[in-house]
Structure formats: structure tokens, C-alpha cells
From Swiss-Prot:
One of its GO terms (molecular function) is SH3 domain binding. Residues 442-445 are annotated as: Interaction with PIK3R1. This is TOM1-like protein 1. Residues 22-154 form the VHS domain. SUPFAM superfamilies: ENTH/VHS domain (SSF48464), GAT-like domain (SSF89009).
Length: 475
């Protein structure tokens, strides 16, 4: 791009560069010919209005150079008189008026009183409107806000003096350029300002009292009625008051622009705020009415939404009486109990014991094992079922003791066939563990003296241990 500037720089465009040169502080006086050339470019190019407003905003924003501000205001004044609505509508936006021009009134910029009055005159004059349907609502809002803050605007009749001073600075200004007074005669009413006499002020106050009364009635009706259960007579009256309030608000806005009396202006601003709140309340009321009517037109949808639970039915708790459901995890346990309860311990069931290291008192071991078992697994296990026909004479009697049948320590037949126990499998962990341990000859082994066998038990134990040791050594 020309001049080595980025596209975001407002001065990068050809029009922006012209505005930068025309408002430079090194220029002694306004170059009206250059100003007219800028106006022609704005009117003949599509992006001219946007580029011009961006360049002017950059020149004015945070600028402490009074000369550049004065030249920029002169260029704005000429462009507003000679450019079309596309440029004028951008200038009267709140973004430019409030965020750019009004900020120059801050005391830190120390603008001369003449320059400050010129800015205020622009705001007041623009708020009165332009031909061509330019929306001036935003600049009018800024004007009313300044009035509310107590800012005193200079009369528009004083603008010719300002222009006359500007003419003295530049005697070479072309005569074809219209001045501010000519603009006022074109776009402003014949009587831009009104000086109210006491009779007019009294009549205005009476009309404002009527507006206040209407606002109170509207507020009371809105508070007493709710959408869906409203009184038709009240609603009809409310509609009439709303229509009248809209008309009164337009008149108040017009009076705020032309009335010079400060006390009257303050009163108009206050009444306008109250009336605006009542109008907004009525519009909110009508929106709620419309929403209720739409819901009544679709009652099925409303019923469906109201009857739907807040959570899925599968997640809701059933607080009613429910029959107890058996827990599935207890099924295997109950089946095991049923199988074990049918067993008879005194029958020819295999009993797994440690054949190599039997206890000295197997009956006491059984008692200890019965104390450690889970009672629910053996509900039908009693001392009568475990009673045996063989007992020891030298063993002390216990009230709850249960005696076992004698068990042989070898696989050879040492008892009648009816009392014989089946041998353990060769891969049983008991036999595997015993095969890894050397034989011990110092353990006292107890045997049943009543058993019908005469074979030496110790020899067979030694033989079995030796066989296990040999197999272990071979591995």
C-alpha cells in the first residue's frame, strides 16, 4: 500500500491521507478548496463515508493539539453541509459523538471556550434532525444526557459570530460554500429556540401534571392485573393510555430540543423518564399476554411438558410396599448348604487329612475346626451325626466332644471293607508337599490299637518317605 502503512490505518487510504494532510497542525489556515475536494470524494466513492469518519476519529481522539482539533471541526462542519445522508448518519452515531467529540470537553484537554461551544453547538444542531431521513436518535440521546448533567448549550444564534471569526482567519474561503447559518435556515425550524413566557410555562406544567397522572394510572393497572386474569376494562383503558403516552413522549422530546428554560428542561427530562418506564412496563405486559395465548393454543404440548417427570422413571425410588426379592448372589451359597446338609459324616465319606503328620488328638482338632467353620454352611451338623462306634478309653470325656472313626495312615487294607477310605490322588497338594520333605523318625505317631491289623506302621511310613525322597532326588 502507498505510504508504507497497514490496511488498518485510517490514513492508509487515499481519502484518509488527504484528511491527514488537511488537518495537520502545520497548516496555518483552513484550506477550503481541499475541504471541498474531500467532500467530493466522500460523495462519489462507496467507501468514502466510512474512510472519512475513521480518519476524522483518529485525528480527534486523544489529541491535545488545539490547532488540529480546530481544523478537524471545520472539516466536519463543511462535510455535514455538503455530503449526503450516508456520511451524516455515521457522524451522528453515539460512537462518534459521545466517544469522540464529547470526550474533548474533558478539562485535561484544556480546549478554549470557543472550541467547546462549537462542539456543543454541533450536538444541539444535529439533534434537531436532517433532511433525507437521517436517524438522529443517538445524538439526541447524547444531547439529553448532557442536559441532565447540567451542561449549558450555547444558543444557535451565536454560531454566526463563530463563523465570522473563522472567516477572518481565512479571507480566501470560497463564497459558494454554505455556512452554518445557511444550514440552520435549511434543516432547522424557523424558530430553533423558544423562550417561554410565564403563561406558556404554566400551561406546560399543567400538561406535564396530566402526563404524571396518566403514568400513575398505568402503573396501578399494571400492578393490579396479571397476564391471563386481567380485567378487560382495565386493559382497554391501558391501551388508550399507552397510545396517549407515546404521543406525549414525542412532544416532550421535541420540547427538549427547542426549550431554553433550564428549569423546564429538567422537569421535561424527569417526566420523560417516568413515562418511558410506564411504556416499557406495558410492552412487557403485552409480551407476557402473547406468550400465554400461544401456550393455550397448544395445550397438549404444555400438558406433556408439565406431566413429564424431572428424572427417568427407572431412576425414581419406589416407596410403596414391595415383596422381598431374593438376592442372586446367595443362590450358590444356598445350594451348597442344601448339598452339605444331606451328607452324613458317619457314613463312608472320604475325609482328607494329613497322612504323614497326623495329630496326637484328632478329636480335638475336629472340635477346633468346627468352631472355626461358618455356621450357616452346616446347619444340620450335630454331635449325633458324628457319633462313632470306636472310642478311646484313656481320652478325657467332653460334654460336646465328637469322636472320629480311626483312619489308616497307609493305602494297604488295614480295616474292613466297610470302613475303608479311598486313597488320595497322586497329584493332591498334600502328597506333593510331603514328597518334598525328608522323613522324620522322632515324631510320635498314634494309631488305633483296636484296628484289626498287625502290620508295622512305622516301617510303612519310612518306606513311603523314602519313596518320596527318591522321587524328589530323581527330579
Amino acid at each position: 500500500m502507498a505510504f508504507g502503512k497497514s490496511h488498518r490505518d485510517p490514513y492508509a487510504t487515499s481519502l484518509g491521507h488527504l484528511i491527514e494532510k488537511a488537518t495537520f497542525a502545520g497548516v496555518q489556515t483552513e484550506d477550503w478548496g481541499q475541504f471541498m475536494h474531500i467532500c467530493d470524494i466522500i460523495n462519489t466513492t462507496q467507501d468514502g463515508p466510512k474512510d472519512a469518519v475513521k480518519a476524522l476519529k483518529k485525528r480527534i481522539s486523544k489529541n491535545y493539539n488545539h490547532k488540529e482539533i480546530q481544523l478537524s471541526l471545520s472539516l466536519i462542519d463543511m462535510c455535514m453541509q455538503n455530503c449526503g445522508p450516508s456520511f451524516q448518519s455515521l457522524i451522528v452515531k453515539k460512537e462518534f459523538v459521545k466517544d469522540t467529540l464529547v470526550k474533548l470537553l474533558n478539562p485535561r484537554y484544556t480546549l478554549p471556550l470557543e472550541t467547546q461551544n462549537r462542539i456543543l453547538s454541533f450536538i444541539k444542531m444535529w439533534s434537531q434532525g436532517f433532511p433525507g431521513g437521517v436517524d438522529v436518535s443517538e445524538v439526541k440521546e447524547v444531547y439529553l444526557d448532557l442536559l441532565k448533567k447540567g451542561v449549558q448549550f450555547p444558543p444557535l444564534d451565536g454560531e454566526p459570530e463563530t463563523k465570522q471569526e473563522a472567516g477572518q482567519i481565512s479571507p480566501s474561503r470560497p463564497t459558494s460554500v454554505p455556512t452554518a447559518p445557511a444550514l440552520s435556515s435549511i434543516i432547522a425550524p424557523k424558530n430553533p429556540t423558544i423562550s417561554l413566557v410565564p403563561e406558556q410555562i404554566g400551561k406546560l406544567h399543567s400538561e406535564l401534571d396530566m402526563v404524571k397522572m396518566n403514568v400513575k394510572v398505568m402503573t396501578a393497572i399494571l400492578m393490579e392485573n396479571t397476564p391471563g386474569s386481567e380485567n378487560h376494562e382495565d386493559i382497554e383503558l391501558l391501551r388508550k393510555l399507552y397510545k396517549t403516552g407515546r404521543e406525549m413522549q414525542e412532544r416532550i422530546m421535541d420540547l427538549l430540543v427547542v426549550v431554553e428554560n433550564e428549569d423546564v428542561t429538567v422537569e421535561l427530562i424527569q417526566v420523560n423518564e417516568d413515562l418511558n418506564n410506564a411504556i416499557l412496563g406495558y410492552e412487557r405486559f403485552t409480551r407476557n399476554q402473547q406468550r400465554l395465548l400461544e401456550q393455550k393454543r397448544n395445550p397438549t404440548e404444555a400438558n406433556q411438558t408439565s406431566s413429564e417427570p424431572s428424572a427417568p422413571s427407572c431412576d425414581l425410588l419406589n416407596l410403596g410396599p414391595v415383596a422381598p426379592v431374593p438376592v442372586s448372589s446367595e443362590g450358590p451359597l444356598n445350594s451348597v448348604n442344601a448339598q452339605l446338609s444331606g451328607l452324613n459324616v458317619s457314613s463312608q465319606s472320604p475325609v482328607i487329612t494329613n497322612n504323614l503328620y497326623p495329630s496326637l488328638q484328632p478329636q480335638m482338632d475336629l472340635l477346633a475346626s468346627e468352631d472355626t467353620e461358618v455356621p450357616t454352611l452346616f446347619p444340620q451338623r450335630t454331635s449325633q451325626n458324628l457319633a462313632s462306634s470306636h472310642t478311646y478309653d484313656n481320652f478325657p470325656d467332653h460334654s460336646s466332644s465328637v469322636l472320629l472313626q480311626p483312619v489308616s495312615l497307609h493305602t494297604a487294607p488295614a480295616a474292613p471293607s466297610s470302613q475303608r477310605l479311598p486313597p488320595l490322588p497322586s497329584n493332591h497338594p498334600v502328597l506333593k508337599n510331603s514328597a518334598l520333605q525328608p522323613p522324620s523318625y522322632y515324631e510320635v505317631m498314634e494309631f488305633d490299637p483296636l484296628a484289626p491289623t498287625t502290620e508295622a506302621i512305622y516301617e510303612e511310613i519310612d518306606a513311603s518317605h523314602k519313596k518320596g525322597a527318591q522321587s524328589h532326588s530323581e527330579c
